[in-house]
Amino acid sequence: MKAGSGDQGSPPCFLRFPRPVRVVSGAEAELKCVVLGEPPPTVVWEKGGQQLVASERLSFPEDGAEHGLLLSGALPTDAGVYVCRARNAAGEAYAAAAVTVLEPPAPEPEPESSECPLPTPGTGEGAPKFLTGPQSQWVLRGEEVVLTCQVGGLPEPKLYWEKDGMALDEVWDSSHFKLEPGRGASDEGASLTLRILAARLPDSGVYVCHARNAHGHAQAGALLQVHQPRESPPQDPDENPKPVLEPLKGAPKTFWVNEGKHAKFRCYVMGKPEPEIEWHLEGRPLLPDRRRLMYRDRDGGFVLKVLYCQAKDRGLYVCAARNSAGQTLSAVQLHVKEPRLRFTRPLQDVEGREHGIVVLECKVPNSRIPTAWFREDQRLLPCRKYEQIEEGAVRRLVIHKLKADDDGVYLCEMRGRVRTVANVTVKGPILKRLPRKLDVLEGENAVLLVETQEAGVQGCWSRDGEDLPDTCQSSCGHMHALVLPGVTREDAGEITFSLGNSRTTTLLRVKCVKHSPPGPPVMVEMFKGQKNKVLLTWKPPEPPPETSFIYRLERQEVGSDDWIQCFSIEKAGAVEVPGDCVPTEGDYHFRICTVSEHGRSPHVVFNGSAHLVPTARLVSGLEDVQVYDGEDAVFSLDLSAIIQGSWFLNGEQLQSNEPEGQVEPGALRYRIEQKGLQHRLILQAVKHRDSGALVGFSCPGVQDSAALTIQESSVHILSPQDKVSLTFTTSERVVLTCELSRVDFPATWYKDGQKVEESESLIVKTEGRKHRLILPEAQVRDSGEFECRTEGVSAFFGVTVQDPPVHIVNPQEHVFVHAITSECVRLTCEVDREDTTVHWYKDGQEVEESDIIVLENKGPHHRLVLPAARPSDGGEFQCVAGDERAYFTVTITDVFSWIVYPSSEVHVAAVRLERVVLTCELCRPWAEVRWTKDGEEVVESPALLLEKEDTIRRLVLPSVQLEDSGEYLCEIHDESASFTITVTEPPVRIIYPQDEVTLHAVSLECVVLTCELSREDAPVRWYKDGLEVEESEALVLQSDGPRRRLVLPAAQPEDGGEFVCDAGDDSAFFTVTVTAPPERIVHPAARSLDLQFGAPGHVELRCEVAPAGSQVRWYKDGLEVEVSDALQLGAEGPARTLTLPHAQPEDAGEYVCETRDEAVTFNVSLAELPVQFLAPEAAPNPLCVVPGEPVVLSCELSRASAQVFWSHNGSPVQQGEGLELRAEGPRRILCIQAADLAHTGVYTCQSGASPGAPSLSFNVQVAELPPVKLVSELTPLTVHEGDDATFQCEVSPPDAEVTWLRNGAVITAGPQLEMVQNGSSRTLIIRGCQLKDAGTVTARAGAADTSARLHVRETELLFLRRLQDVRAEEGQDVHLEVETGRVGAAGTVRWIRGGEPLPLDSRLTTAQDGHVHRLSIHGVLLTDQGTYGCESRHDRTLARLSVRPRQLRELRPLEDVTVHEGGSATFQLELSQEGVTGEWAQGGVRLHPGPKCHIQSEGRTHRLVLSGLGLADSGCVSFTADTLRCAARLTVREVPVTIVQGPQDLEVTEGDTATFECELSQTLADVIWEKDGQALSLSPRLRLQALGTRRLLLLRRCCSSDAGTYSCVVGTARSEPARLTVREREVSVLRELRSVSAREGDGATFECTVSETEITGRWELGGRALRPGGRVRIRQEGKKHILVLSELRTEDTGEVCFQAGPAQSLARLEVEALPLQMCRRPPREKTVLVNRRAVLEVTVSRPGGHVCWMREGVELCPGNKYETRRHGTTHSLVIHDVRPEDQGTYSCQAGQDSADTQLLVDGD
């Protein structure tokens, strides 16, 4: 039998989620989802957290894994979010969807045009319905297209067509569209035909026919595709085809894209008629395919998108647009950037048949590079569908069970997003599949196309598994179209086209159009004029929302964070909120927002808050209460609103600010409660003297009262008030207590209606008011109902006594059992008690004992035995013991084969002399087998052993030999197990060398590598540097017995390296180093040479080395040379050269050529050559110049450092005086800056001072200056004032000096005068001419001159900015301004009024600022009104000044005033005018002078004084005069309360009463008493009293903790602190404690009498403080203090101490222990399996007793092996990990009682 783990199944998983639904009120709403799971899940529907149940309108249809919710007659209340929750044993899943219920559409008038918005689709009988819809068509350009639709409906609907969402008259070129209205067949419905004459390519699109009437709207669409007809080939084959496109005039734009990325081209073309667009690549037209998408975006642009670009996509892309008016082109050059890391072998396009497989294969550069597969943008994970294989660097993707949707672009991507792309073509009935997904904006048209292989076939369109209506489907030949016009969110889903077994699917996603929410209301205001009401006003949002909207008003109580909705208002701009609208009294904030179908605006909060009080009504009033003496009396009433109220008792108001209070010391106590609308008054423990009391309740609008009646009762039960249910375990102590209202009153106990009788097992006790029934050791038979009965009243106790719970010790976990047919199966369950009865269940049914199932019970062990198991006996078994269960899963396997192992052929590889064991496992231990080798039965011998052990059969070869190789069979019946043994020799070992060998040799020396093996015939392989060597003349391999040699007869340096002798299982390593021969210089023979060369010249130093491959180094003067253009190194064969192409004298020196072993020296000297003139090569021609012209003489020498001498006519030339001598490298230059006649002559440049040195001569000739003359004359000019005047003339020569004169005076350049020289031209410019600039202008050059006259005309002074009419208020300053075209002199303009010059007035001022002239009138008067003008000699402008009387306004406004009650308030304001008469008002009522009202007016100041103010005078105070009204707030507050006399210091004795008193200034005021700065709260010892203006604090039974400082606080006033001192009371013990001896379980009483009554004592037992509760009761009767201890225990023994102040009394408590006995003993014998744990358990007579566990008489100590437990009276010993050595006798010692258990260990 073998154990395993079970399968937990799979949790629920949603294959299709429910989708949101929008329905009209009254229609059906249906939600559907598909959910799977193992086991099949249970599905429930919820809404608002509540599970839904089926009803008349609600049902839950199910169809396999599909679950639905069907809602009939949907109502607005049904709207909300519905949750589908699926559960099974493996988990839980849920999905949600929203249901929106719309109001039914209201009838609308018939629209006038197609621009009207469409109404919501109707569902009534008269709504439009398409009888015949338009059909999609595919036509060639120039053909005629006819689209027809026929619609029924009442009234007859109006029809109109749209193209791509636009009305036909909005289409750019619709002149060839023709509409033909008509009637349908049989005169049924209306029809409208759209005829398109000579269709053009731009006519392609979606055409939608709309039908509308008063009941609703319907629409149907069709797709029209117009194709370009194919061009016919030319008739003349020799004729070259015409180019498709015109050549580009300019260079195209360039676009780069990384390989594998997308490229997007967009062009925007305009024209009329609308152009036709074609895309071309390198002159070839492009058609859309998998990687080339062509479409038109929403902005009208034409887009070409190339997906996953490859190298073959590079080229020139052209967008060609043409219409009847012409054509235009736009081009871009696409470059595809290839990555550095590339696929070694990229993907190739593949084809496959539907339902077949295809394989994509590529190769990466490195096998360790990870890759990922994609189908377009979707990552593919390995699965049965997509098998991904990696073999080294090869990557394969195998696509199984091809479908039409598998057609597409596939990518393999490695790191760096490097991709290789391939197309997968799926051949099948569907040629062109649907796109993976389609995104459409809400309201747009959705078009889906499918092309099939065969024409005329009928396909099926569906959405989310539901067939779509025929009106939106069209087919034409091979093409099938689905047109969904005006899609909504409900149209979203999975669209499928099915054709036989083929199908293609797309995900239609509808994107919602974003609508902006409405704006918030504006100008919100709050008015609180009326009591308990508030008026809220606002204005509509700006701009107003386009759709209908409402206002939502919300409130928030001050101090709370929650806003609660008050009203929803449609059109009102104001609302009054009364107090009845709030639930509780308080201050409230308000806010408002605008709500429409597009959302909600931000909230706007009204400033301030309003105090509102709900109007309460009495819902349930007070009722008279009758109770018994000592009981609580409860008075309650319910109100209609949450409001505060006051309780009264006999006319005295009860304090409601404290939860508990007392009417007066020693009198009735009460508690006030308020929960929501309910108010309660609880009078606690009422006495007979309180009978007849009158209880009242009062709040605004409600007053009620009731009477209290106390009834006398002989006795009643204080506790328990209700029936008590108790549960105990056997042997546990049970105590039932009933407390009566009277002491020592008799009571009788009953059980199940029968009077009980006292015995040892049932004890009845009475102590004062308490009556007890005790069951010392309860048994199961003691269960029942107990009753304590007295004087007609009873207390009931339900007692249940149960056995202790049973625990399953073994197994602790789920057990899985595997067995075969006829095998015996045992299921064992061990419990912790022997007397426990267990029940066995199989697959939920209780099993019964039979021949095939045996049940065994032995002590705590319970077994279920299947003697001969069958497959049908398998299943889930449970062993149930009490509340615990043990689980077993049994699997019985039928035997189809005798041989269990091995199930396949076994191959065994062994070496000679090794031990080989062949094992075969059978399903039956008694089966006999037959062993054969190579077909012959084997014979057992010392060399071949046959073994048998249970079901195992073995063949053993102790020392296998080579001849033992072969096929061995273990045969039984018709079966056999095959073993193939292959015996080989033991591995070869290398004896020598054991370590790595290192050899050093010289070139041509013989090198021998030797290796000795452990076997002579063992083959070896030799390797050098990892490569196997090949024998040759230079490398010889030898074999001599066990020795193997590798010989290098004449080793070379390249023969060095690492050699390995590989003998298969062992290797030897040799490191050989061959040193090369010495490197020698063969030529020249001499080691030092002297060489001489001319400079500059070519120098080459040469030597030959041996061997030819030797490396050399060159040095110059001890430093290694560096290669450059001036020094070159060469090597050819044995020759080594150093070359100086252009040697200079400085290159002379010692040159050394050095090899590793030798060197040769070259002493190089360089002699300079004589200097030669290199340029010019011949004597230069004479140089002729004019005076002033620069002269440059230049020559080039053969040596840059050569010195030259210049001479002029034989005289040396010196630098300076206009001569400059320069040297630039080999060039020598003489420069004459400005030649004159003295510079004429021969200039000579001589190289060196020695006679006969080379020289070069230059002949320079300077011509005489020509005469200066004027070539052109000046021209007279006439200009306007402010313009520029330009005079120009020409002179010869061009550099002649010219002087300008005006009116005979020489002029110079300045801001107004500008002089310009340009060659021979001379110009004078006079800027901004003035009248004074007129005159004669002269230009003088040498002796010649020319003159011209300048005339300046005056410019008209015109107004550019004219006067504007002005309106002003009396007393303001007025400014009139004009702007002139030019800046005139002062006085050129004048101001007039009424046609006359301005009068002299100090209030009138004029000013000029450049072009601006300004008239200012200060403090304008009514008399200043009139027409004002400004005029010049050439222009005039007028304007009207209107003056209105001065407006009355406030200079200093009214201010809010706050005063205390009885005080006075002064309001004052200052106006802008004097002598104004106004009215004062308060709260809207006009005020008149009186004793409390004083009104004053002084000049512009107005004052109001109000005196003797009260709280009711708070409100608004206003002043009104003419059109002016201003207001302020008057706030009257209560006079603050003050403390007239504070509390005084007190000193009291402990236990006495302390009284503090303070006196206030007012009678009605609340006082807070504080102690040490902390507020005091009411308690039984603390009382507060109010006597007029006096406030008392009474502190009863003072103790030391009451000492401290006390003060009273009222408002902001605080009294001086008063100190309370508490003196300790002298206490003495009058009667000492007495010691007590008692037996365990009994009680003990201690009494102590002290000298003082009001004293608190403290009890201790054994040093521990005692507190009442449980087994301890403490009470005080006057001076006597009593301690009662019940149910004594041995640990209670100790010293009892009572202490009261300094007094103390001690006594001794002795508790005699009862003998400890065993109630339940452990079993005499217990059997435990090995490695399990054993539990021994014993129950003793009382808890707390000591139990000792021993083994073989030795006490056991707790630890890892042994664990002791105690639970009440039960003691356990747990032995962990039981071993055979743990077997023996275990003893338990409890007091004088003991018990033994024999522990037996079963198993190996």
Curated annotation (Swiss-Prot):
It comes from Mus musculus. Residues 12-100, 128-225, 241-330, 339-425, 720-800, 804-891, 902-982, 986-1075, 1078-1165, 1176-1261, 1266-1442, 1536-1621, 1625-1694, 1702-1798 form the Ig-like domain. It is found in: Cytoplasm; Cytoplasm, Perinuclear region; Golgi apparatus. Its main location: cytoplasm. Keywords: Cytoplasm, Disulfide bond, Golgi apparatus, Immunoglobulin domain, Phosphoprotein, Repeat. Core component of the 3M complex, a complex required to regulate microtubule dynamics and genome integrity. It is unclear how the 3M complex regulates microtubules, it could act by controlling the level of a microtubule stabilizer. Acts as a regulator of the Cul7-RING(FBXW8) ubiquitin-protein ligase, playing a critical role in the ubiquitin ligase pathway that regulates Golgi morphogenesis and dendrite patterning in brain. Required to localize CUL7 to the Golgi apparatus in neurons. This is Obscurin-like protein 1. The lineage of its organism: Eukaryota, Metazoa, Chordata, Craniata, Vertebrata. GO terms for cellular component: 3M complex; centrosome; cytoplasm; Golgi apparatus; perinuclear region of cytoplasm. The gene is Obsl1.
